[in-house]
């Protein structure tokens, strides 16, 4: 297992330190199109090291005809900065389209050099959509909790009546009374699961080592449903403990890993699940009920190389009864989203064929003065 923290970097200058403190990718492009400087956020965005970025031409990182190339030429010609919003920016390395806001400006001290800052919109947009869904779901959850009690009472009567009939029924009719009892039990089980969504009691929390949780989930998976799947771990050992309920975190990641295992079940020896943790400073958003913006510095990911989630399901993937499985109830991911939300965090999914990522961003972190203590893996 390796992490970015284990690689030694040269001591940055003041200017480099300021650039690396920015949460958004920043590039400095020379007149010939080469990237001569990049910050650490650019390393994460393009999924290659800054040392490699500094040897590349920008044309090798973005598709032919990319609007970014045209904007750079426009700024170089006019000498004036340009902002462009909601630009689809794909890269040959990571594939697909990533929607970003582009801020392009000339560097007056170095003629012909252009500064490019990219601000990715997908995470922010998904967070806003998830918070909107969470707020709208509260009324539905309240209705479900009220109906749960009203549904159980008549079901109990129906089941009791079926049992009485069963005592005097013929063998053929007993099959029908047993069917009535089984279906009543199935509805009660479904109602019980729905009642979980109406549970708004405070979550009992304490310091939790996230790597211990992930290791526990991995062992459970490898001894059962993911016995033939190859696991890859990429952990940041410097992460602080999470202020959370350990049992609920295990439930979250066990559900995500089980979904990933089902997604790669037909890949045989190529089946792969990756577990990653990272510290992402600068991710902040406003949450209903809180006056200040909340910091979400911890990132925990479950990735798989399965066929991916259908694009039309992605926006509503964490809503109840949304599922890609013929026999699924569609409540697993909805419960995961509820638990993460109860902890003050956000969960999102990015998916394309051979690369699906479930990302949990956590808001409740135990901070220890100015440093982040190391914890064992």
From Swiss-Prot:
Keywords recorded for this protein, A-Z = ATP-binding, Cytoplasm, Hydrolase, Kinase, Nitrogen fixation, Nucleotide-binding, Phosphoprotein, Transferase, Two-component regulatory system
Catalyses which reaction(s): ATP + protein L-histidine = ADP + protein N-phospho-L-histidine
Q: Which GO terms describe its biological process?
A: nitrogen fixation; regulation of DNA-templated transcription
Keyword Hydrolase set for record? yes
Residue span(s) of domain PAS: 13-80
Identify the InterPro entries for this entry. HATPase_C_sf, His_kinase_dom, HisK_dim/P_dom, HisK_dim/P_sf, PAS, PAS-like_dom_sf, PAS_fold, Sig_transdc_His_kin-like_C
**Claim: Cytoplasm is one of the keywords in the record:** yes
The UniProt PTM text for this protein says: Autophosphorylated.
**What SMART domains does UniProt report for this protein, alphabetically?**
HATPase_c, HisKA, PAS
Recorded protein name is: Sensory histidine kinase/phosphatase NtrB
């Amino acid at each position: 297992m390796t992490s970015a923290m284990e690689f030694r970097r040269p001591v940055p200058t003041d200017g480099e330190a300021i650039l690396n403190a920015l949460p958004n990718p920043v590039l400095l492009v020379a007149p010939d199109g080469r990237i001569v400087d990049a910050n650490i956020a650019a390393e994460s965005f393009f999924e290659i090291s800054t040392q490699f970025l500094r040897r590349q031409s920008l044309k090798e990182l973005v598709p032919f005809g990319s609007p970014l190339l045209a904007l750079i030429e426009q700024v170089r010609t006019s000498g004036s900065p340009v902002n462009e919003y909601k630009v689809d920016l794909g890269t040959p390395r990571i594939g697909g389209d990533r929607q970003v806001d582009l801020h392009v400006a000339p560097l007056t001290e170095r003629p012909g050099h252009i500064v490019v800052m990219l601000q990715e919109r997908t995470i922010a947009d998904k967070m806003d959509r998830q918070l909107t869904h969470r707020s709208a779901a509260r009324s539905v959850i309240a209705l479900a909790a009220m109906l749960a009690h009203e549904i159980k009472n008549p079901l109990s009567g129906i089941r009791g009546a079926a049992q009485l009939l069963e005592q005097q029924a013929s063998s053929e009719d007993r099959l029908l009374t047993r069917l009535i009892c089984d279906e009543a039990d199935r509805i009660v089980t479904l109602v019980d699961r729905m009642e979980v969504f109406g549970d708004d009691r405070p979550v009992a929390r304490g310091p939790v080592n996230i790597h211990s949780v992930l290791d526990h989930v991995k062992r459970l998976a490898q001894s059962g449903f993911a016995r033939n799947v190859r696991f890859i771990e990429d952990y940041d050992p410097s992460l602080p403990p999470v202020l959370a309920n350990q049992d609920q975190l295990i439930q979250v990641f066990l559900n995500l890993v089980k979904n990933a295992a089902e997604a790669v079940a037909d890949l045989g020896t190529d089946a792969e699940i990756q577990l990653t943790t990272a510290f992402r400073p600068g991710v902040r958003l406003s949450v209903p009920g809180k006056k200040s913006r909340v910091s979400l510095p911890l990132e925990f990911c479950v990735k798989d190389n399965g066929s991916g989630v259908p694009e039309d399901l992605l926006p509503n993937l964490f809503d109840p009864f949304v599922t890609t499985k013929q026999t699924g109830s569609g409540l697993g991911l909805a419960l995961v989203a509820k638990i993460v939300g109860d902890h003050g965090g956000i969960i999102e999914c990015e998916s394309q064929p051979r690369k699906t990522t479930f990302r949990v961003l956590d808001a409740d972190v135990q901070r220890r003065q100015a440093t982040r203590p190391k914890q064992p893996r």
